[in-house]
């Protein structure tokens, strides 16, 4: 049986902002990482998982991406990134990029266009709904507090944001969204990266109709059961594998809150052709009571 390199690799996450500052501006950067590659290699690290370095207004530490194919100025340039990849491969180390495609920044060009009008060609790249009786479309709460819906007066509708109001959710039911995401992934893979860590990837498929959570509680409540491991999640990940991932010798891991060990097998079984691994959080709650 042929060995798969990712099963035997030691992976180290680098949060670039706090890792190593090469120019004394108080912010870690790509050149700082390059300067420590020999040290990281000596520690026995095979793969670096690089937290987001894409262009971003930085509302959520880079997880609000305004351009997937540019590097945030604070971290350096694309030339610096190219040098990092080259120097890593020279040391027989591999680079895994963070893939954040449940949502973008509200400063991404897709969203800027989307909010201009209801008939804009990018409108359905995001999840827009009219209000109900002067309120939000449903009672879902956002991970960062408050409603998961933000009213936008330009078109008198609300957009869904499961996280920050500056992180509108992409509409994965729109095939054009999926194809644009796949093209972006190919951009980085053709540059030579060795894998993706996929941020909250099991949130991308929402239940049809976006139903409200049935509860006696007032205010905003978790809508997880209506978007976590949603109805088309396996269809979309299989499609991603078929169109992109299977064409490269890479490592893939999905961050998946709320996935049980049995459900994890559905995402990672080789015969299912989706992902190779998941971050599974069930064990984190073993000593938690009803209130957390």
Predicted regions span which residues?
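Hydrophobic residues within beta-strands of alpha/beta enzymes
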Residues: 48, 196-198
